[in-house]
Amino acid sequence: MGCFHSREPTATGKTKKEEPTSAVKTNKEEKSSNYVSEPTTMEKIKKDDVYTIILIGDQATGKSSVLQRFKNNQFEVCHKPSPIIIDCFTKKIQIEGKKISLKCYDTAGQEKFRALSQSYYRCADGIMLFYDIANQKTFDNVGRWLEEVHRLAGPNVPILIIANKCDLNEKRVVNFNNAKKFADDKNIPIIEVSAKESLGVEEAFIKLASEINKTWKPLPDNETVTIGM
C-alpha cells in the first residue's frame, strides 16, 4: 500500500481522487458507514484545498473521542479498541477567509495494525500525535512515534502534539511544562485538549491546518494522489 500520482483523466475529462480502500471506514458526508472493499472515488474539489491529517499515538489516548468531538461535537467514551483500523471523514473549515477541507484519518494504535497505519503517513499533509496526560507510558512513546513519522512521512510534515484528557487533571502524571520543553526542543507545537469537556479540540485542528497552509502547494488540476493497495 502506498501513494502515487496519476495524470490519467476520467472519461469526462476530470481527474478523480481515490480514497483508501483496505479495511477503511470512509465517510463522504460525515455519516457512519461499514468497511469498504471496493474503491470509492470523489471528484477533485476545485474551490477548496484538501488537507490530509493523520491522527496517531498509542492505543487509548483518545484519538477517536477527539475526532468525534470535532466531527459531531459529541463525546463518546471508547472502552474497547475499535474494530475499525482506519476511520476517515472530511470536514470543511475556514482559515483567514480560505475554505479548507480537512480529510482526517484516525489510525488504530494497536501494534498489530501498525503496518497498515504506517502506509498512510506518506500521504499526510499534517499529523496529530496523541498522548494521555494520565498515562506516562503514552508520553514516553512519543519519541518513538516521532521517529516513525520522520522516517515515513519525511522531516518537513507539520506535526502537532496533542496532550489529551486534560479534564483528568487530578490523575495527571505528565507535567505539561516538561512535555512542552520536550516539544520545544524538537520545534514541535503542543496543545492540551479534552474531548470530554470540549476544550481545545477545534483549536487544535485549526492550528495544524494553519501550519499546513503556510507551505501548502496544491496539486496541478490534472494531477491526483491515490492512497490504496
Swiss-Prot record:
A motif (Effector region) lies at residues 79-88. Keywords: GTP-binding, Lipoprotein, Myristate, Nucleotide-binding, Palmitate. Belongs to the small GTPase superfamily. Rab family. The keyword Iron does not apply. Residues 1-39 are annotated as: Disordered. This is Ras-related protein RabZ. Disulfide bonds: none annotated. GO terms for biological process: exocytosis. It comes from the Eukaryota. Although this sequence lacks the C-terminal cysteine motifs subject to isoprenylation in other Rab proteins, it does have N-terminal myristoylation and S-palmitoylation sequence motifs. SMART domains: RAB, RAN, RAS, RHO. Residues 15-32 have a biased composition (Basic and acidic residues). The keyword Transcription regulation does not apply. InterPro entries: P-loop_NTPase (IPR027417), Rab_GTPases_membrane_traffic (IPR050209), Small_GTP-bd (IPR005225), Small_GTPase (IPR001806). Pfam families: Ras. A lipid is attached at residue 2 (N-myristoyl glycine). A lipid is attached at residue 3 (S-palmitoyl cysteine). Gene3D superfamilies: P-loop containing nucleotide triphosphate hydrolases (3.40.50.300). GTP binds at residues 57-64, 106-110, 164-167. One of its GO terms (molecular function) is GTP binding. SUPFAM superfamilies: P-loop containing nucleoside triphosphate hydrolases. One of its GO terms (cellular component) is membrane.
